[in-house]
From Swiss-Prot:
Pathway membership, UniProt: Carbohydrate degradation; glycolysis; pyruvate from D-glyceraldehyde 3-phosphate: step 3/5
Gene name linked to the record: gpmA
PROSITE patterns in the cross-refs: PG_MUTASE
Catalytic activity field: (2R)-2-phosphoglycerate = (2R)-3-phosphoglycerate
EC number: 5.4.2.11
SUPFAM superfamilies given in the database record: Phosphoglycerate mutase-like
Alphabetical list of PANTHER family matching this protein: PHOSPHOGLYCERATE MUTASE
Its job: Catalyzes the interconversion of 2-phosphoglycerate and 3-phosphoglycerate.
GO biological process, one term: gluconeogenesis
Name this protein carries in UniProt: 2,3-bisphosphoglycerate-dependent phosphoglycerate mutase
Keyword rRNA processing: no
Length: 248
């Protein structure tokens, strides 16, 4: 039996402002810092230990990991950062307020952009200054691999091969792994682990800063999974994520 823990980063400044963030490198809000520390404390109090951590190359996930490591006195464990764990790329929606976008394009269209499996938002133009190929952190990556927009299907396509080739073998070797990432990169992994259909995946919402624990069998198939937190608070947090793109 193997144990894997997934955590979506704590609330970011743009989560608080209800803006599409994607690959924009936005930091944690004060509440997000508190969420990350609370996650680390909960993991420590429940006796969890980790040998290795994976995260994205975006500071909201990295800082969440730092705060968890600090709370658990695990600053020393190896950390692997990879763009393949980045949030889904929101293309031309990046930076826009979700409610204002609903008012402009309609709730149904925004829901499709946010939650459909295979329909991406409008793409960045190549000359956009947020084009990932302009950023030093992505210079070692082939330009053809860097997205200008993504749907969840695209996020699955870049993350799950990395899971199969890099992370899964480490877990099978007996290492206890922690992954701090983003709402959609974690939705991609949960879809894979739980074999969620393309039709049902739009209904999956992952709250910020709450550890999601998986107990996996020898084939890395889930035996059970659960959030490490008060059940009602978890449900309320999921509902809040669900309602981010709804007109008020």
């Amino acid at each position: 039996m193997y144990t894997l823990v997934l955590i979506r980063h704590g609330e970011s400044l743009w989560n608080r402002e209800n803006r599409f963030t994607g690959w924009r490198d936005i930091d944690l809000s004060p509440q997000g810092i508190d969420e990350a520390r609370a996650a680390g404390k909960a993991l420590r109090e429940q006796g969890f230990e980790f040998d290795l951590a994976y995260t994205s190359v975006l500071k909201r996930a990295i800082r969440t990991l730092w705060l968890i490591q600090e709370e658990m006195d695990l600053m020393w464990i190896p950390v692997i950062r990879t763009w393949r764990l980045n949030e889904r790329h929101y293309g031309a929606l990046t930076g826009l307020n979700k409610i204002e976008t609903v008012e402009k394009y309609g709730e149904q269209q925004v829901h499709i952009w946010r939650r459909s499996y295979d329909i991406p938002p409008p793409a960045y133009t190549p000359d956009n200054l947020d084009n990932p190929s302009y950023h030093r952190r992505y210079q070692e990556i082939k330009r053809s691999d860097l997205p200008m927009t993504e749907c969840l299907k695209d996020t699955v396509a870049r993350f799950i091969p990395y899971w199969n080739d890099e992370i899964a073998p480490v877990i099978r070797s007996g290492k206890r792994v922690l992954i701090t990432a983003h709402g959609n990169s974690l939705r991609a992994l949960v879809k894979h682990l739980d074999n969620i259909s393309d039709t049902d995946i739009p209904d999956l919402n992952i709250p910020t800063g709450i550890p999601l624990v998986y107990e996996l069998d020898d084939n890395l198939k889930p035996v059970r999974s659960y959030y490490l937190g008060d059940e009602e608070k978890v449900k309320a947090a999921m509902e809040a994520v669900k309602n981010q793109g709804k007109a008020k």
